[in-house]
Amino acid sequence: MDGYNQQQQQQQQQQQQHQMNLGSSGGILHSPQQQQQQQQQQQQQQQQPMNGSNNQLLGISNGGFGTMLQQSASLPINIQGSNSFSTFTPLSADDSNLKKRKIKNEDGTYSEIPYSPNSLVGSNGGLDSSFLMLQQQLQDQQQQIAQFNSSVNSPSFSLNSSQVNNNNNNNNNINNNNNSNNNINNNNSNNNINNNNNNNNNNNNNINNNNINNNNNYNNNNNNNNHNHLQTTTTTTTNNGLTINANNTPSQLSSSSLYPGIIPQISITNTQSGYTPRSISPNPSPNLSPTNSPIQSPHLPTDNYLMIGSENENSDPPSPMTQYNENPPFTWTDYKSEPWYTTFNTNGDEMPVPLLNIMASKGFSYIGGQWIYCRRNHFQLDITAVYPKLFQETQYGHNGVTLSNSSSSVDPTQTPSYMLISGVKTPINGLTLTIKGIKNRADMSQQESEVELFQTNSKREKQGEHAPKPVAIQFGSLVSIQRLHFRKATLNNARRHGQPNPHQEFNQLVVSLYGRCMGQEYCIVSYVSPALIVRTATQVTPPGDLSPVHTPDYAGTSSNNGGGSNNMNCFGPTISNIDFSTMNIVSPGHSPTSPRPLSQLTSQGQTNILRLTQNHNNNNNNNNNNNNNNNNNNNNNNNNNINNNNNSNNNSLGNINNNNSNMLTSSSLLNGRINCFNNNINNNNNNQHNNNNQHNNNNNHHNINNQHNNQNNNNNNNNNNKCHWNSGDTEKSIVYNGKVGINVENPAYALSVQGTIYASEGVYHPSDLRIKYDLKSIDSKSNLDNVNRMKLYDYKYNPQWTHMNGRDPYLDNCDRGVIAQDLQRILPNAVRTIGNKNVNGQEIENLLVIKNEALVMETIGATQELSKQMDEMKLKLITYESKLKNLKKKSKNQTILLIIFMITFLLVALYMYKPSTHHSHHRRHNFDNNDN
């Protein structure tokens, strides 16, 4: 420890000696008395209260840059050419003043503003020279920077190489306390002391980037009031150097104080009606909501849920910038075109009305006091259904007198289980979300008129368009309804005399939450969007004109809260926000991508100052001593994904140039394009990169590797316990090895389904002879006997059981079949148990199920037996028929013989009768003759 103190003292002495040498030779540093005065001024400003708790304005007062530059004869400025910003073009003042642009005022009139830089008037007066003179002076400064760099690189001007190398290549953290005696506590050592800067910070994600290059210390520290604000503190220089105010409180930054007589006062172009130039390149604004979308509902208390409602006492307070013509939120209101039904939890307790947190992140613009939508674009709705955490519960007596008032707290993500329908608690079978488009109605008593709202496929093909289908939702989970658009535009979109058409037609979106009970859908809650004007195409204005602020379209997402940007920290402004042709700095919050301006003019002669917005990014530890914090934050942001963690660490190292360039931009005004003191900013970035690399090589690389291995092991263990779906060998197929349950918590079989199964082509079972043995024939008489012993019943299912199976418990509960207990006595192998089953809170032990295939096989056997019996009956019938035929033939022959016999008998009798008659007549004749 003594050796470390001695080393500190030696470094302090070397630092003071080096300062004295530089001061005596006309160097860069101030005298000790001047440094002491500046440090005392810094301590006084530290004790002053900060103006505003959430929004700190970044700038450098005249005591900083202005004081130094008034003392210096010339400032070496090196402006590198780049395609990322506009270059200066020689224009005469007269020609540039001829070009003017129109600005629309609040009263509908237009005013003209010239494009020339001469039209820019600062708080300190107008321009001292024309734009051409300004360009010539800047070119002269480019020549001076070469001489200045050569003088800096000279041996008399060089610093101790070991000290510079230690600051640029080693992980040596400088903790500049700025004491009154101007003693620099340089805690640099080759032993890589761990994070000495954290002693002065209050558990914030502070950015502490320390460098010493030519005795210019860029020490960027965050405030200690739990807000990530940027402070720029460096030591001051005397001659031919850059002076930065070494104060902990941010001061005002103005171009006139930086370059008096050279660059005019810089102000932000802004109008009273909230318009911005369309030509500015869009950049994500960090002053957005946690969901990176301004078109949303107010927030739920203490959570990031987007609560919807016209009256919300518990919502977050509005932004302090609402007084500057901020766009109103895309507010959804209650829509009670049909009754809302009360819901209950699993315990039967009444629940409050659910909240639909709807976020419309794409497709809508606020123009002229109306929400505009282009029908050729698509929009997306992200919806979450939750219960409010706190709600008021009031009990009333029979005479309407209030008995008690109490507030209850509920779990926002719990799912409703019952719904009150006609005074009866009915189980809820499922929850669905529906979306539709309607025409705006002045009176709710008018009939609702729907408009065509379509949803396209991922390829956005017209053939794939269809009306939005109901989407299943669970409480607490996010559901995204994508690629929605209106088919037709609204009527009377044309304006009359510069005013909205009095006959303008509007469309609205309706989002409803339905619960399915007894085969029908019942509305639980419903919301309607603001009135929308649907246009065929967006209105195109000339480039010089001013267009309204547009809604951002965040196509990309990131694990960081950077508005879809890959940067770890989104500080503004960036290089794309500076228009060098007019020397206007456009605030990122006032760019076309954000409807909320960060700053706005209160008067034409007042100078706007840059404001560093609150950084909500958790990955602010992109410095040389917070690798462990980076690992933790990356694990939290990237869901403990080791790949994303490593990528985030690489991004944090790779994006140091961007982040630190943005931080130092506010102090140098040109976003790192002015390379002062032999490119100290690049050295600062390289220092951070090398410091991080060396620090990781010494300490954190092993920790990160160990953490990487541990996380891989944990992930492997977790993955072993999770379900894995794999793609099959054939096209469009998936494979899962295990038991699958549909509406079944603990499936006992490979596929357990609580409901109805539909198969258009049937179900096939293996029945190959090669997988069977010990075949025995079955007497079909036994099958017939078993079927005859079975009893069929007409019965009704329990309503709770019917509801569990997705059927109407009152209209679709009748069926016909056998009873498992009866079948078990006849066919024991056809009945099994699946264990206990809970039906509406009632436990059923050893629920019996039957195997329908066994009944089918018994029926087949019985049918075969009946077939055999029928065959036997047929044989008997044939025999009896042949016998009957023989009998018929015999009887016929007998009849013929009998007839013949009868005829013969009659003939014989007749013949015998005639002779006897003739003989008696002859005898009588003879007797008569004898008498005579």
Curated annotation (Swiss-Prot):
Residue numbers spanned by region Disordered: 1-63, 152-256, 269-328, 540-568, 582-601, 613-660, 680-726
Domain of life: Eukaryota
DNA-binding segment(s): 286-546
Keywords for this protein: Coiled coil, DNA-binding, Membrane, Transcription, Transcription regulation, Transmembrane, Transmembrane helix
Annotated Gene Ontology cellular component terms: cytoplasm; endoplasmic reticulum membrane; nucleus
Chain intervals with Polar residues compositional bias: 49-59, 311-328
Function, in words: Transcription factor which acts as a key regulator of pstA (prestalk-A) cells differentiation. Essential for ecmA-specific gene expression.
Name listed for the protein in its UniProt record: Myelin gene regulatory factor-like A
